[in-house]
Amino acid sequence: MTTLQTNKDPHLRGVSPNPSKIPVLSQRCQDFSSVKSRSLDQENQDPRTPAQKPPRSTQRQRPLTDTAGLRSKTLHQTEKSPSLKTLRNPLEELKPSSGGSNVGLVTHPQTEAIGAIEFVADPAALATILSGEGVKSCPQGYRSSLAQRVLVRERKGGTTQRGQSARSSAYLAPRIPTHQVGPARASCFSRLEGPGLRDHTLSPPRLEALNPPPGSSHSSTRPSLQELRRETCGGGRDGDCTDRRTSASQASRLLLKTPVQPASLPLRGEQEAVPHSDDGGGRHHLGLAQRIPLKESLTNTRSTYSSMKRFAIRRKAQFTPLRSLPKVQQAQWLSGLSPHSSPEEPALPWRQIAMKLFDQESRITLQKEPRKPSVASTSGPRPKRTPSHQELRIQRINILQQLLQQEVEGLAMGDGAPLNGGSAFDMTELKLPTAEISRTLTASEHNSGAALVGLSQHSGATEPLLSEECEEPQAYPEETKAAQPCSTTELKPPVPHRAEPELPEPCLPALSGPPLPSCRGQAEPPMACPRTEPGASAACALEAGTPESSTQPCCNQGPPATASLTFSSQSPVCASPSIHSLYPTGYSGPSSLAPRTLALRQRLRACLDTIHSFQEAHLDDECAFYTSRAPPPGPTRVFTNPVVTTLEWQDALRFVPIGPVVPQDSPS
């Protein structure tokens, strides 16, 4: 029946906008409910099919609940109340008028419905809504603000009298998205566009609390107030539209005052309003609410998204710092060679670790090899080995170079009796070797460089060379005598020296043998070591016995170890006896300088021998390679072209040092 009446009403709707203007004010409460149902029906149904308007009353009664269930209830109610239907007709008129005019309560509805000019005010109302004033306006399409908005679009449709139908169609369009949104989620697409935030909208109770001044809403505030009224009327299932109008106006004011509150507003009103806006039954409500909240939601959404962005940014900032902190810590750990390795930056840390490990190994070797020399050479720095490997290397190299230069100068100044044929070395030879040694030291800083430094500092390193060169164990006993002044570190190295002969690379084991603390403890200057620790003589004597075997094997191993330059160069250095000889310089030389010069000569000789042996081994390898390689090219070629053969020989025997004999044969 209501449907039939609503069908009959269309002419009233179209014609009644004028009379509905005034009645809207007086009847809005009653019409409000009826209009709710109508607007709901219209929104739910095509505006052109007003027969379905009975749901209007249904939605009108329970706009906040599920539109489907509410519709059934409202259908029953619509059947029960034909008066509501009659009211609905004027309400419909008022509704179009209210939709058409911002002054839904005033007589403008006709003009608004007739002309879209008055709807221009609606844009302002919509703007206010967007600003957040009436954003909350519940999805009650019956409200004049909603109707106005709808009418504006309706105007766009180009229908004035049928604006309601157009409105309902417009509502339908928006309500489709609204339907997509859960009714419980978005009460009127509450100001907060976000689905989670939509629920936080003004609640009818709050609006009612704001109600006290009835009729407080008018043209300027109507859009928002009407929306609020919709919320209040929709939220409250009572038909008191006036109270809710006032509450809506107040709510709109509150919204204007606090546009951001919706998120914090109680969810009850939102939920109630949600059914109107979200319910399929309250689709027209939803459409209206959607439009308004959608527009308003833009601002709300902005704020919401901004907050979301803030959260995201904060999260990123928090997590990123956490990650970065571990990275830094890991980098620090890596710098400290801690077991922890940075997963994000493995390459650099591992490289550094590898470098450090090698450095540490070199240190250990150097400490153990030149433990004694290191004591003298890095007397200050040794205890500080913690400093940096590079610094220690540089210091050692510098000290070694200085010592070598001083010793060479001393040799030039005073011809010290050459130990073990030390005279064989001319000063020029010494100078050249010193330059070579300095170069080699610079080349291999931590390996041979540090060892040479220790040896030069302790001058004992020369003794192993001397013993190797002269193969005179007596020199070691002498060294032991002189070694008595040597530091206990010398004593410790002797043991490693003993071990050295056993190991193919005795230097490394010997180095490992001497404890670092002893070296550090013996960090005293080379001169101080002999002075401070005369008790080392026993160890030196032991070394004297072992040095022969140890130093000789070191030297022997050095040349054979030519495959690895560092080892060959280190082996002479490794020989701890050389260290002993350094401080026992007094025994060998007529003067303190003489023993040093002799030790230096011995060291230089050993170093040079090792270097030469290494080079020779390489040359031998190259010669063997080239020689073995030369024969195949001839047989492979069927025709022996003299030019080709010569070229092949040149290519194969291009090695100049080896070539002189073979190239002569090869051209032939």
Curated annotation (Swiss-Prot):
GO BP terms: cell adhesion
Region (Disordered), start-end ranges: 1-102, 154-177, 189-285, 364-392, 462-502
Compositionally biased region (Polar residues): 27-37, 55-64, 158-168
Native organism taxonomy: Eukaryota, Metazoa, Chordata, Craniata, Vertebrata
Keywords, ordered alphabetically: Cell adhesion, Cytoplasm, Phosphoprotein
Cellular localization per UniProt: Cytoplasm
Stated role: Could be involved with bystin and trophinin in a cell adhesion molecule complex that mediates an initial attachment of the blastocyst to uterine epithelial cells at the time of the embryo implantation.
Quaternary structure and interacting proteins, as annotated: Directly binds bystin, and indirectly trophinin.
Modified residues (Phosphoserine): S16, S97, S169, S306, S324, S338
Coiled coil: none
One GO CC annotation: cytoplasm
Name recorded for this polypeptide: Tastin
Composition bias type Basic and acidic residues, residue spans: 227-246, 269-282
